[in-house]
């Protein structure tokens, strides 16, 4: 059974650093990005990672205006600071993770 998708209100209420990963299990771009995403996230254990199966009629993806997969949204205390779309570059991913991680200590 699939976990229920969080609401936009629940996502906006999250504290700390969060990466939302929108995609689909059958998406080739999503599959190709998984090793890069997983290896970079392993270096930032303090960052919450939420994978969201996206598609037609999925409200959370629409509320973030997700159009291509994968889309990674880097958030701090419910506020989007950066996003990566489709071609996930390891350097850009690391930069986004460092951005939200750096905000952990200082607030």
Regions found by a protein language model. Name each.
Residues 73-107:
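Non-catalytic, surface beta->alpha helical segment in thiol-disulfide oxidoreductase systems
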């Amino acid at each position: 059974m699939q976990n229920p998708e969080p609401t936009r209100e629940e996502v906006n209420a999250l504290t700390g650093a969060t990466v939302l990963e929108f995609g689909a299990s059958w998406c080739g771009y999503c599959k190709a990005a998984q090793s890069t995403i997983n290896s970079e996230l392993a270096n930032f254990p303090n960052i919450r990672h939420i994978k969201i199966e996206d598609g037609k009629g999925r409200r959370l993806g629409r509320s973030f205006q997700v159009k291509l997969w994968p889309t990674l949204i880097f958030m701090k205390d419910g506020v989007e600071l950066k996003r990566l779309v489709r071609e996930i570059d390891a350097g850009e991913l690391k930069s986004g993770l460092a951005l939200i991680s750096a905000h952990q200590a200082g607030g």
